[in-house]
Each structure stands twice: as structure tokens, then as C-alpha cells.
Amino acid sequence: MTENTKYIFFTLIAYKLILITIGLWASKKTKSFTDYFIAGRKLGPWVAALSASASSSSAWTLLGVSGAAYLWGLPAIWIFPATLSGFFINWFFIAPRLNELSHSRHTLTLSEFLSLSNNGSIKELRILSSFIIIFCFIFYIASQFDAAGQSFESTFGLSKTFSIIFGAGIILFYTLLGGFWAVSLSDTLQGVTMALSAIILPVVALNQVGFDLIIADIGAQSFFSTPTGVKGFAGIGFILGTMGIGIGYPGQPHVVNRFMAVESKEKIFQARIIAIIWAIIIYPGMILLGWAGRSFIESAQNEQILILMGNQLLPPV
């Protein structure tokens, strides 16, 4: 293990200990089903905004968006309005209404909320919605664990299987221990870390590579083409398909249940500003990082570009 790897390893251990501490603290705050499932409906704007943003973006943003920008070049710019539209849909249309109705109906889960009608609860709808959520989450969680496994594998040389089991064990421990409070606070910490990464690393990369070199690299591409340079209907189809990312945001139950947990509608209005500012920092930052990487490093795995550039440009911690 190199000196740099040792620093990264001890930083990771410290982070895991913080997560366990959050779980222990949250377990003392959890005294009822309402506390466990939606934090007693007491989430403030900062925790709600940052935890919802981080859980909606997580690994696919850090690794996927930067990797797409590295691989695609200029056409990756469309990821930004696509994701930002998802934030607007969630925070301006879904969040206020869901918060108000879930409070008035005293529902704890999204499945329970969806199953309610004027004539009471529809059992079949609750079962169906629960099945859909569980089925889709199998693939979503698998992709998150795979991303974590890739990070461990490339940084420490550990097997992906061991890395996934280790990470899953920590997550399972603090989640079962502290419930929604633990998840929300750990996601808030993740959101802050992501924002710092999206500010610091692209700035350092830009300083290293130079803005002129980035412009020269992507300048030959068209805004209205596919990543392979095809224009016309194919380019329009690519743009529309990419913009479709925003439609998926209201369909993420682990995100919209934050809206149910926010203390009041007024706090929703405050949280939406924080969340949108966060998105404006994160997505352009990751796109810029990917563009800088095209002129700085050669990688067969485009999704590793953030990790590779971080290892080369930043101190180990």
C-alpha cells in the first residue's frame, strides 16, 4: 500500500466511523414509527434539500456525468438542463403538494400515500406500488454498490465483491439503527462532500489543463449532434432522450419521501432554493471535470475519470 493509499484508507475509515456515529445518534432520536420512517416530520430545509439532492444524484452524478462528459464531449452539456428540470419538477410541483397532503392524511410511506382514496385505502394499489418500488430498487441499489465497488477496486486494489459487501454492511448497520434520521443526515453529509468535490476538483483541473485547451477540444463538436457527431433527426433524438432524464426525478421514492418528512410547507420553499443552487454547482462542475479530463488523462474506463483525476490532482485526503 502506497503512502497516498494509506491516507485515503484512513480518511475512508474516519468517514465510516462518522456514519456509524450518525446511526447511533439517530437511534436515540427515534422513538416511534413516525420517527423511524420519516424523521417525525421534522426535517429542516438544509437537511431536506441536501439529502434529497444527494440521494437523487449520488454515484451516477459523480462517476456517470463526469464520465459522460469525458466520453461525449460537448453534447454532454444537455445533461445539465435535463437534470435541472427534474429538480424544478420535484421542488416546485411535487414537494409542496405531497408535503401538505401527507401531513393531512398522516401517511408514513409513499406506498401508503398512493393507496389512499376518498373511500379509504386500496390494498391492491399499496401492494402493487410496493412491488414496483422494490423491483426497481434492486437495479438501482445494485448500480450504486457497483459504483462503490469500482471506487474501492481502483483505489485500494480490493476485489469488487469484498468492497460491495463491506460498504453494504456499513450502510445496513446505520440505516437499521437510526432509520430515516440516519439516512437523511448521512445523505446530507454526502451532499456537502459532493458539492465541495464539484467546486474544488474542476477548478484545480481547469487550472492544470487550461480553458483554451478545453475549448479547442470540444469546439469542433456541435451542440445539436449525437456524441458520435451525427446531426439532424439523430441529434434531435439524442437531445430529447437526454432531456428525458428530468422526467425520472419525481419517480424516485427515496427522494420524494423527503418531501413528506419536511416540517412545513414554508420549509419546502426554503429547501427548494438550496436544492437548486446545489444542482447548479454539481452538474456543471462534473461536466467541466469530464471535459478537462479529455485533455489531461487517457482512460479506458470513462466512469473512473473523477477518481483518476482526483488521485493525480488533489492531496490524498
Regions found by a protein language model. Give the residues of each.
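Juxtamembrane interface elements at the cytosolic ends of transmembrane helices
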Residues: I18-F33, I89-S111, F145, F173, ...
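Loop-to-helix junctions at membrane interfaces in multi-pass transport proteins
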Residues: T2-N4, I38-L43, G64-P81, S115, ...
